[in-house]
């Protein structure tokens, strides 16, 4: 295998990657026997696989079925060894025998996957899936029986003892009734788990001794093992197997989270404090935010259009794969052919390339990068929230929140840090969770932790406030809490960790959605200055949070002077050259350029106008709209000198034409008004541009959209209404 995977292979990294924990039941799909094997070599491979299964460790779940499978395979191993010892028979097998051995290899390989799945599964998950797992073992026995029935025993010249073992094995594969695959002990334990959920459903948490007994029988004896079970259930919720009962899994998840603090001593919090956030819990970073340049993106993972790592790979009608935003932009610009092959696009349907997305995600994992696929943000939060919608889950989460708030109030510094971390996770999903956590009085307690000398306590406290602020009524509670805004800005200025500072910026972004809070945030000493500094010097993630906060603040009519004196305008101008934040920066500048002083500051730089035109050419539809709006404000308020400078930009003619044809309604309007201003200008260069654009305008006289756009008067950029906040 090592020879087959060359250094240039895009999947070479998989050879160095530890096998991931299997999530899905592994019996569906096609399996193939190893090619090129036959005769004694194939038989040895089958015998080796059977022997390894017999000698393998027994998982705690499905022990009865695993033991029964091991007994059958022990008989099979004895039969295979008998055949191998008969050198005359092992020399050459008939085609029928080789075919049977290949099928036997497939059955054993599926058995190995099933046992491995059961061994790696969380105990709670295995209990919930017990009926499905039992059915899988029953299917394995049936498949093994079929192969043994067609095995040509006569041509293999089995000994008398081997023939007897074969008959016994065939009988064993058929003797078990379906009910015998279900372990009564596991069924009883599963029923006890369901009974605990029913008590929560009635609003009566189970007593601690019964929960302790239940966890002990499930093999969950420590806080760390309980946390591992919680992580595993979250992974299963996100994997969304087709027949998974998400509300039931979410209820068990909430029960285990309650047990984590109700059963295990929270004062011994070191294990929970040091427990790492799972990959699904971490706030996803941009590839461009890292400083590691010791690797290059495989060309197979790069979009042929943008040449960047594909975040959302999709397959076009020609069979070529592109990143979704890039191919959508290509189509919206009026192209009807495939960029890579040149073939005509039969339609505009785009099919997600999930296999490639999985490989890209694994590659990012190997190199320590986090892959923000479109399904991993909004979809993850929505999925977990939906799974916790049952009454039992909500009651368990409420009971957990009560314990955590008490820990915040009365615990040691170490316990408070753990409580803040768990509240952060509990507030990650579901408006009900965010509502009752705030109702229990968590916000003032979290605010106090912002002053903590413990970096983890501070980081988790500010992130918990961010997650709580997503619920609209909680924004008011945070802003009304005396000193809370000042403390959030303090973390933004002097936080112990980069993540704490970034989450403080994200919290300001979330709070700035409310119009009445914009001025309060702007007037808080240091708030706008620190956002501007983060926009200039922060990581990609920090810049994104900062620019979105500044964009929201810019929608306030009194923001211009504050933005100018705090150097936020300069930071926004510099950010036009950064693709990560250029679209939001252009939108903020368009809003701020109601003030002549800002217009001249922005328009005085040749690179600003060039950057805006570049964004009009390559940005998303919203980015193009922001860029053309900013350019419109420069032309409208900057005077004829700036109009002349705009008119000299190479390629502006083509960009304006493209936007008037394919842009958003507002972008078309602004582009048409830019054309009119250039035409009215008496400057020679502006007149030259105007004549060129007049030709374009006349050629499109029949275009109703452009004709309507040409009749529009001056318009203002409307304020943003909706936002999307990623939850750390």
From Swiss-Prot:
Matching InterPro entries: ARM-like, ARM-type_fold, Armadillo, RING-Ubox_PUB, Ubox_domain, Znf_RING/FYVE/PHD
Name of one Pfam family that matches: U-box
EC number: 2.3.2.27
ARM repeats: 441-483, 526-568
Top-tier EC class: transferase
Annotated pathway: Protein modification; protein ubiquitination
Domain U-box, chain residue ranges per copy: 296-370
Gene Ontology CC: cytoplasm; nucleus
Gene Ontology MF, one: ubiquitin-protein transferase activity
Keywords annotated in UniProt: Repeat, Transferase, Ubl conjugation pathway
A GO BP entry: protein ubiquitination
Substrates-to-products reaction catalysed: S-ubiquitinyl-[E2 ubiquitin-conjugating enzyme]-L-cysteine + [acceptor protein]-L-lysine = [E2 ubiquitin-conjugating enzyme]-L-cysteine + N(6)-ubiquitinyl-[acceptor protein]-L-lysine
Function noted in UniProt: Possesses E3 ubiquitin-protein ligase in vitro.
Name of the protein described by the UniProt record: U-box domain-containing protein 4
Lineage, opening ranks: Eukaryota, Viridiplantae, Streptophyta, Embryophyta, Tracheophyta
